[in-house]
Amino acid sequence: MSEIKLIALDMDGTLFNENGEISEKDKETIKRATEAGVAVAVATGRSYVELPIDLLCGIGIRYAITGNGSAVYKMPTMECVFSDCLDIDLVCEILEEVAKLDVYYDVYIEGRVYRPESVTHNIRKMDMPTAVHELVEQSRIVVDDLVDFVRKTGKGVEKTTINFAYLGNGVCKDRDKTTAILDRYPQIQYLTGGFHNWEFTRAGVTKGSGLKFLAERIGVAMDQTMACGDSQNDFYMLEEAQVAVAMGNASAQIKEAADFITLSNNESGVAYAIEKFVFGMHE
């Protein structure tokens, strides 16, 4: 196996534990890897403004694949080195339909996230950890009319997220209706980032495509890459990477796609994987 030169790490459920924190063991091991010349990037469904920039840069992480692969940014400068955005008219057409449902939704534009005032009451209905709730409330820029805002800015939309209230027994409010809307548009692809949501990007855009761009940009061959993840939006990234690592807490789909299953996100599984595949430990 080729020497690993680039590692892409999912954040929620992978790098972050259930308390939304990076363990000291993970921090130390990532920093050790970057000091040894390995490039480490986060690969997330989050926008740039939702990233803990100082924390990530402090352990040597300098790139962020955001919006499920729709944009790649340098940290801490927020320089966008790659973007593959949704068509504005298409997004507006979909949002006009989604707005008729009892859901929460927002859009990602140039590393920031915007939501309409009308969905404020739905934030607390979303089934997600307290830390993520707080992040959503603090990071979103509120506008009166989101469709009108998107049209007037004239800037491409990196990703759109739609969250559902969880009713129990696997049922989410208006998810089936939303799915029926999204299924009418072959120009997009959607998946879940966890927390009972759909996230859609332009068709063909994934964390895997973002990883391929970043590897090419920094001169790393794909057979020198490793990726760690836990949920559906990590699937294509694991498929593209030479070494695909599933967290111990990962979904069955991700575990089946992986070359190796590490410890859980509450057990510093990222550190264990880096120690194994970069430093040759745990043989």
Locate the predicted segments by residue.
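Active-site glycine-centered loops adjacent to acidic/histidine catalytic or metal-binding residues
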Residues: 10, 44, 230
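Short, structured coil segments at secondary-structure junctions
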Residues: 59-60, 68, 76, 184-186, ...
